[in-house]
Amino acid sequence: MAGNSRRRGAVRKAGTKKGPTVGSGGQRRRGLEGRGPTPPAHLRPNHPAAKRAQSPPRRPAKRTEETETVLGRNPVLECLRAGVPATALYVALGTEADERLTESVSRAADSGISILEVPRADLDRMTGNHLHQGIALQVPPYIYAHPDDLLEAAAGSPPALLVALDNISDPRNLGAIVRSVAAFGGHGVLIPQRRSASVTAVAWRTSAGAAARIPVARATNLTRTLQDWADRGLRVIGLDAGGDTTLDDLDGSDPLVVVVGSEGKGLSRLVRQNCDEVVSIPMAGSAESLNASVAAGVVLAEISRQRRG
């Protein structure tokens, strides 16, 4: 259009007109004749996909436990009274002392735990701005035993008495069961590596110090470990309200593994299938079930009674 001829770039300069697109004249196509179909990307040496395929596989990240920090005057004091292993006690500068803080500092000093005074802002950062009341206790990760260590702990003594926990999720139940195992002559506790409560400061505190004496082991595959123990001569006894026998008929004289199911679902299907016997606890009245740690304590007490008799 004549009206647009003044627009910059509207009129092509002489000698700048593009010519027809020029191809290879079929040379590239003829050069590929007889070579077959194009190989997949991962088989072409210079293709990024081939380089990725030839590189060594990435190793999965190693799962490590994290240091735990206990916050607050009552929780910290309870941990120190229970002998929970700790590496450092942090106290915020300017914190008003009371009997709990004074006793915590005294117990930490007697136990050889480092006592560090830090600015309150630093303690806020360390604790993620959670309520700490001016005091925090650093607890290192628990060192778990190997399942074979539990068998070694039971060797050369009365018949083995071990407890396996099938996905117990409450650390207080774990701690209470560890305490019952210690009280009734058990040799160790086995937990799954995944989907299970860990030996945290809460579990340690609930065990009333028994976690220092009773080894807790982790199994990568709980069912497989129970099968291995059964092959080594241990009877696997599951606890369930719908058991095929009652506690009154249980013979506790053999080497035993007592398996306690999770708080809500009880024994998982595979674990139940690998039990030699499933035992229920007879109860009076309308009570339908017991807490997992209470049920474990009842059974362990009965086994201990039989072995004493």
Curated annotation (Swiss-Prot):
Q: What is this protein called?
A: Uncharacterized tRNA/rRNA methyltransferase MAV_0574
Task: Indicate, by first and last residue, each region the UniProt record lists as having compositional bias (Basic residues).
Answer: 1-16
Q: Which superkingdom, per the lineage? A: Bacteria
Q: Which EC number applies?
A: 2.1.1.-
> Keyword set for this entry?
Methyltransferase, S-adenosyl-L-methionine, Transferase
In the UniProt record, which is one GO cellular component term? cytosol
Q: Which residues bind S-adenosyl-L-methionine?
A: 261, 281, 290
The UniProt family comment states: Belongs to the class IV-like SAM-binding methyltransferase superfamily. RNA methyltransferase TrmH family.
Q: Where is this region: Disordered?
A: 1-70
Listed Pfam families: SpoU_methylase (PF00588), SpoU_sub_bind (PF08032)
Q: InterPro entries, alphabetically? A: Alpha/beta_knot_MTases, Ribosomal_eL30-like_sf, rRNA_MeTrfase_TrmH, SpoU_MeTrfase, SpoU_subst-bd, tRNA_m1G_MTases_N
EC main group:
transferase
Query: Would you kindly state one Gene Ontology biological process term found in this protein's UniProt entry?
Result: RNA processing
Q: What are the recorded GO MF terms, alphabetically?
A: RNA binding; RNA methyltransferase activity
